[in-house]
């Protein structure tokens, strides 16, 4: 819903000035934003066997000290993300694969809009992200639950906010 509200503002960004090209670093941020989950296609999370001792230690430290430190929280978030993709094997689901393929195609089409205008490029990248989230929502919700969906959408949207 936040993304839709954001998309409503994009057409209002028009100016009479000639379009300004994005810096490479900004384009890279947009690509990273949309490829958070495509990343897991080519790389796997650490196996839980290797990861578990670190997570156990982090949980023990947090329980003993009561301190909420970023590395501990980061480990827990990483653990949750790994469970979504390894325990539930969402990325192997035929329906989810079609979401990734559609997102990849939409990103490729957006790359084509780069030359015409920055606004068109950003609109298409947002459309690709919105399409991915809408497509993957019922799959992740059904296979992993609402907590997993909250985590996935939060990570994706927070990455988008870094750029925009």
Curated annotation (Swiss-Prot):
Source domain of life is Eukaryota
Give the protein name, as stated in the record. Answer: Uncharacterized protein ZK370.6
Q: Which organism is it from?
A: Caenorhabditis elegans
